[in-house]
Amino acid sequence: MIYEGKAITVKALESGIVELNFDLKGESVNKFNRLTLNELRQAVDAVKADASVKGVIVTSGKDVFIVGADITEFVDNFKLPEAELVAGNLEANRIFSDFEDLGVPTVVAINGIALGGGLEMCLAADYRVISSSARVGLPEVKLGLYPGFGGTVRLPRIIGADNAIEWIASGKENSAEDALKVGVVDAIVAPEKLQAAALDLIQRAISGEFDYKAKRQPKLDKLKLNAIEQMMAFETAKGFVAGQAGPNYPAPVEAIKTIQKAAIFGRDKALEIEAAGFVKMAKTSAAQSLIGLFLNDQELKKKAKGYDEVARDVKQAAVLGAGIMGGGIAYQSAVKGTPILMKDIREEAIQLGLNEASKLLGGRLEKGRLTAAKMAEALNAIRPTLSYGDFGNVDLVVEAVVENPKVKQAVLAEVEANVGENTILASNTSTISISLLAQALKRPENFVGMHFFNPVHMMPLVEVIRGEKSSEEAVATTVAYAKKMGKNPIVVNDCPGFLVNRVLFPYFGGFARLVSAGVDFVRIDKVMEKFGWPMGPAYLMDVVGIDTGHHGRDVMAEGFPDRMKDDRRSAVDALYEANRLGQKNGKGFYVYETDKKGKPKKVNDPAVLDVLKPIVYEQREVSDEDIINWMMIPLCLETVRCLEDGIVETAAEADMGLIYGIGFPPFRGGALRYIDSIGVAEFVALADRYAELGALYQPTAKLREMAANGQSFFGQASSEV
């Protein structure tokens, strides 16, 4: 053994060939944490010191190659002063450069996922051979960063600036075939032939058949582009990528600027430019929020996995209520492999549900995401029915009928009488109390809420609602089924609106106050979209449905009359009474025309001003900053209350619920991280400035206590890649 550590070993194989193997003890994946980087330095030094070494192959002892850097270490590292961070980054990069500069040929055998620093390690080798099942990429832009272990330097010198920009700015994972096509790897082989292929390649390099020094040299030189080529490659790309990413996500454009700036230099100077730019990105609020979001997502997945031990497998599902929602649920279940019955009392509703599922499957077929055989298999997994005849062997039923407690109770009681004693019933409701609905059931322990978001196939969140009598097995099984459907489940406790709608309606409450204060709703939409929301509140209300919003507002007002009840007529009342229901009937705050693709397109409608005139009670001068605060303070404070009330267990779940459920701007990290970014004490002071607007703007006693004690919602990182 030439070197043995906790993450890396180096052993002799044959004829001067050694294997440097990554296998981080106690972990399911390899990653570049401090330990691994330090051992890589020692391993490279050990290889350099051994005169008998003629070539190195790099392998992984795990199913993946290396998933990247240990993101949990970022949180503390990025708090360091810039100069210290740059120095640390350059020190890490010297390790990769020392590996690259070995006086013998090097081959990396990529057996599985190689992302971020994992792929950057591969780029430092002379040759790369990949398993046909492996995937590679540089996803750092998704964290508000860009590659910091030499990726912006080596990749463009290996595959050209255009291809490198596409790989780095998109942050996509790429197949082995795509990697071979652009030249990221030199060969692709079947998984079982990977080791043999790597050995063959290194032997041919040692023998001189392949000139490894000539292969290495372009990575050490400046980028081979003349001035015109540089302008075409970089200036065009910057404009296009800026349009795609938007102003709130600077990392992709900054990555291009770094590649451009470093293009005229050799490797070592180029790495210095990369390090300075990487650290600049690490200090942005976008990076801090997106890293927090990543860690929250990992925590969410861990929590969901924690239910696996108690969960029963859902082999057969059913959905009550066809139509668009039922069809969407049926599609999602079937396409992910769980057969599902789709029941309704009307044949036309069944047809509507089947049409919805067929349309969604057809869309995937057109985009190449599904084969014709898989589409047929998924369609066959959806069995329409008008009766309960086949419900005896169903493991879980999703009730998705009209949002009316009496109707839901009647349907749930009826289905309970037609299923097995252990069958779980889950109500897809957005606001109605699960404990209230459970009163109609003989086995309330088998009943939970399962709130899907519309459109089902696109929205990643499912709220699993625990009622007063819901058993742990019922909750766990529903969580497992949601995961099986490809969704991100969050378990919440029962209350009006649960988590997402309970938080959303105070946001709408802020909007209603602004409109009643004479602020143009089009301006409000523009300000909130600029803030980072995918759509402004007026447009969102139109998409949700004015009638749905009207009903939800009343439910929330009944549940929380102290702060959500408003006796004055609002914009939603005025539109509802004028039968302007939003996109569903072509007119709400906006009117809707059909575009060339058959999708609704919003258009301003002067006539709506007459409808809204009676609910404008004053004319206030408000700044754009005021608009943001009128909207965001109620949303943030209600999120705080949900956490304090135990509706949601952790700050991470609360924030991810808002990002996945209502499109909270990801680069701001979620409501609680947004408070942290302002500072809890500063946020409380900000809310107090708007206290005259009512109870929605009143911080809780506990939040004031946090402010006084200098506390925050997110302390140390607790999850790993």
UniProtKB/Swiss-Prot annotation:
Region of interest (3-hydroxyacyl-CoA dehydrogenase), ranges: 312-721
Chain positions recorded as NAD(+) binding sites: 325, 344, 401-403, 408, 430, 454
Region listing for Enoyl-CoA hydratase/isomerase, in residue ranges: 1-190
Pathway linked to the protein: Lipid metabolism; fatty acid beta-oxidation
Site annotation Important for catalytic activity: residues: 120, 140
Keywords: Fatty acid metabolism, Isomerase, Lipid degradation, Lipid metabolism, Lyase, Multifunctional enzyme, NAD, Oxidoreductase
Residues that hold substrate according to the record: 297, 501, 660
S-S bridge residues: none
Enzyme Commission code: 4.2.1.17, 5.1.2.3, 5.3.3.8, 1.1.1.35
Reactions accelerated catalytically: a (3S)-3-hydroxyacyl-CoA + NAD(+) = a 3-oxoacyl-CoA + NADH + H(+); a (3S)-3-hydroxyacyl-CoA = a (2E)-enoyl-CoA + H2O; a 4-saturated-(3S)-3-hydroxyacyl-CoA = a (3E)-enoyl-CoA + H2O; (3S)-3-hydroxybutanoyl-CoA = (3R)-3-hydroxybutanoyl-CoA
One matching Pfam family: 3HCDH_N
PROSITE patterns: 3HCDH (PS00067)
GO cellular component terms listed in the entry, alphabetical order: fatty acid beta-oxidation multienzyme complex
Active-site residues from the entry: 451 (for 3-hydroxyacyl-coa dehydrogenase activity)
Any one of the GO BP annotations: fatty acid beta-oxidation
InterPro entries for this protein: 3-OHacyl-CoA_DH_CS (IPR006180), 3-OHacyl-CoA_DH_NAD-bd (IPR006176), 3HC_DH_C (IPR006108), 6-PGluconate_DH-like_C_sf (IPR008927), ClpP/crotonase-like_dom_sf (IPR029045), Enoyl-CoA_hydra/iso (IPR001753), FA_oxidation_alpha_subunit (IPR050136), FadB (IPR012799)
Keyword ATP-binding: no
Gene3D superfamilies the record matches: 1.10.1040.50, 2-enoyl-CoA Hydratase, Chain A, domain 1, NAD(P)-binding Rossmann-like Domain
GO molecular function: 3-hydroxybutyryl-CoA epimerase activity; delta(3)-delta(2)-enoyl-CoA isomerase activity; enoyl-CoA hydratase activity; long-chain-3-hydroxyacyl-CoA dehydrogenase activity; NAD+ binding
Family per record: In the N-terminal section; belongs to the enoyl-CoA hydratase/isomerase family.
Described purpose of this protein according to its UniProt entry: Involved in the aerobic and anaerobic degradation of long-chain fatty acids via beta-oxidation cycle. Catalyzes the formation of 3-oxoacyl-CoA from enoyl-CoA via L-3-hydroxyacyl-CoA. It can also use D-3-hydroxyacyl-CoA and cis-3-enoyl-CoA as substrate.
Subunit structure, as described in the record: Heterotetramer of two alpha chains (FadB) and two beta chains (FadA).
Protein known as: Fatty acid oxidation complex subunit alpha
Source organism of the structure: Pseudomonas syringae pv. tomato (strain ATCC BAA-871 / DC3000)
